[in-house]
Amino acid sequence: MAKTIPRIGSRKNGRIGSRKNTRRIPKGVIHVQASFNNTIVTVTDVRGRVVSWSSAGTCGFKGTRRGTPFAAQTAAGNAIRTVVDQGMQRAEVMIKGPGLGRDAALRAIRRSGILLTFVRDVTPMPHNGCRPPKKRRV
């Protein structure tokens, strides 16, 4: 009879420490994408690997309430709370989009205690590229 090979990484052993929380991140980049319908806040390290993210929809806001400034403030607070626990002290902020949540998200980031090195607006602007869609008639 063949001998059974003992499994080293079996489920019975469980996790030997969570790998995600072991990495300390002193500096990062906070990306805020504010559209008219939703606000998405993504926190990455300086190389661009996602550490934490949150949106107004994941915070429990549904429908038109996702585009409100309060929803953006809540989403930014949720995304930043996890990275502050991982040791982030300094961050750069990139804001994209025309939505109502731009200023509210930035206000929540400032209140979190993270030192901001710079705030940059990276909203894509066409240099007369594609023709825009026709105007809405309501």
Curated annotation (Swiss-Prot):
Taxonomy of the source species: Eukaryota, Viridiplantae, Streptophyta, Embryophyta, Tracheophyta
Annotated source species: Daucus carota (Wild carrot)
Family: Belongs to the universal ribosomal protein uS11 family.
Cited Pfam families: Ribosomal_S11 (PF00411)
PANTHER family associated with the record: 40S RIBOSOMAL PROTEIN S14/30S RIBOSOMAL PROTEIN S11 (PTHR11759)
Record GO biological process: translation
UniProt keyword annotations, A-Z: Chloroplast, Plastid, Ribonucleoprotein, Ribosomal protein, RNA-binding, rRNA-binding
Protein name: Small ribosomal subunit protein uS11c
Quaternary assembly: Part of the 30S ribosomal subunit.
Keyword rRNA-binding: yes
Biased composition annotated in UniProt, kind: Basic residues: 9-23
Domain of life: Eukaryota
Extent of the signal sequence: none
GO MF annotations in UniProt: rRNA binding; structural constituent of ribosome
Alphabetical list of PROSITE patterns matching this protein: RIBOSOMAL_S11
Subcellular location as annotated: Plastid, Chloroplast
Region (Disordered): 1-23
InterPro entries assigned: Ribosomal_uS11 (IPR001971), Ribosomal_uS11_bac-type (IPR019981), Ribosomal_uS11_CS (IPR018102), Ribosomal_uS11_sf (IPR036967)
GO CC field: chloroplast; ribonucleoprotein complex; ribosome
